[in-house]
Amino acid sequence: MSDNNEKQTLRTVEGRVVSNKMDKTVTVLVERQVKHPLYGKYIKRSSKLHAHDADNACNEGDVVRVTEIAPMSKTKNWRVVEIVTRAAV
């Protein structure tokens, strides 16, 4: 469509691994704070993402950085880029 060869910036987020029970897949909990439109109080909001972990390297409690990819399955369209911090065992 476009003649530009510009690369789109991929969305990357950080979150905590809450489940690694699936093969090559982890569940990542991403928390953010949003401001209430009327009262101005900051509220915690969270979402769970399924991310591809090819090496099965992540454990529960690890903080990871994930990036958006083309869908790999019905629910999995994120990939683990790096493990920021390991969980204390």
UniProtKB/Swiss-Prot annotation:
<dbReference type="GO" id="GO:0022627">
    <property type="term" value="C:cytosolic small ribosomal subunit"/>
</dbReference>
<comment type="subunit">
    <text>Part of the 30S ribosomal subunit.</text>
</comment>
<comment type="function">
    <text>One of the primary rRNA binding proteins, it binds specifically to the 5'-end of 16S ribosomal RNA.</text>
</comment>
<dbReference type="Pfam" id="PF00366">
    <property type="entry name" value="Ribosomal_S17"/>
</dbReference>
<dbReference type="InterPro" id="IPR012340">
    <property type="entry name" value="NA-bd_OB-fold"/>
</dbReference>
<dbReference type="InterPro" id="IPR019984">
    <property type="entry name" value="Ribosomal_uS17_bact/chlr"/>
</dbReference>
<dbReference type="GO" id="GO:0003735">
    <property type="term" value="F:structural constituent of ribosome"/>
</dbReference>
<dbReference type="InterPro" id="IPR000266">
    <property type="entry name" value="Ribosomal_uS17"/>
</dbReference>
<comment type="similarity">
    <text>Belongs to the universal ribosomal protein uS17 family.</text>
</comment>
<keyword id="KW-0699">rRNA-binding</keyword>
<dbReference type="GO" id="GO:0019843">
    <property type="term" value="F:rRNA binding"/>
</dbReference>
<keyword id="KW-0687">Ribonucleoprotein</keyword>
<dbReference type="GO" id="GO:0006412">
    <property type="term" value="P:translation"/>
</dbReference>
<keyword id="KW-0689">Ribosomal protein</keyword>
<protein>
    <recommendedName>
        <fullName>Small ribosomal subunit protein uS17</fullName>
    </recommendedName>
</protein>
<keyword id="KW-0694">RNA-binding</keyword>
